[in-house]
Amino acid sequence: MAQNRITRLMQQQKKLLIAYYMPEFPVAGATLPVLEALQEHGADIIELGIPYSDPIGDGPVIQNAAHTAIRNGVTLRKVLELVRKARNGEGCKKITVPIVLMGYSNPLFAYGGDCFLADAIDSGVDGVLIPDFPPEEAIDYLDRAKNVGLSVIFLIAPVTSPERIEFIDSLSTDFSYCLAVNATTGTAKLSGHAGDAAVEEYLHRVRQHTKKKFVVGFGIRDKERVESMWKLADGAVVGTALLEQLAASTTPQECAERAGTFWQSLR
């Protein structure tokens, strides 16, 4: 079995800039050009959202993007098809950076757990993050994912106890994903700056109780915040701000241009 792209990336000593994108948002046909633009302008990992009709844990921007994606025909099967095309260079330059699928458990288990794992790895997916799947219930699923070569990522929040941080760190295959605040995605009230004492204390606590790398998401919008998070974590995830930049686009090409320009501004 070839080594997972995420595993290879985590062996490098670099700070990561990770993109979250909802497929086919805001227009059908945008996904492959956007992936190419993100890769070209320095995205280290690309997270693709799996749209769900009731995304209760997401902020309004991602909720709207999910509903738009559904209207544009996006299903889990469609997402896997797009990943396969991206890996093969069909409709864009070949995408070689790691791809993570992020979505709620209902669509994945409706697809069929083992079928999803097999089809995900076959299409070129490297990892999965299921926010509403408690780690305690994921042990068997985690073993099956590892057997096919998929990296599984779990969430840590500011209220997570030190003991639970260690438990989550032990389960996450390559890295954990830290929520920057106890809030829905993209609606953080905290600044996210390294100078924010609450954020610093939280991420120092995570560092003390983890052996693997961790990245931070939720509410990161610009280069200054990215660099602040790089001082405290191993990577920064930018999603809501990217979707906001794309929202007014009317063609796939315009989406790609906006994605590239915005992503370049974060580096």
From Swiss-Prot:
Q: Which CDD domains match?
A: Tryptophan_synthase_alpha
Asked if the Swiss-Prot or TrEMBL record annotates the protein with the keyword Lyase, the reply is yes
Record GO terms (molecular function): tryptophan synthase activity
Query: InterPro entries in the record, alphabetically?
Result: Aldolase_TIM, RibuloseP-bd_barrel, Trp_synthase_alpha_AS, Trp_synthase_suA
- From which residue to which does the signal peptide run? none
Which PANTHER family does its entry note? Answer: TRYPTOPHAN SYNTHASE ALPHA CHAIN, CHLOROPLASTIC, TRYPTOPHAN SYNTHASE, ALPHA CHAIN
**UniProt family annotation:** Belongs to the TrpA family.
Question: What's the protein called, per UniProt?
Answer: Tryptophan synthase alpha chain
Species whose genome carries this gene: Chlorobium chlorochromatii (strain CaD3)
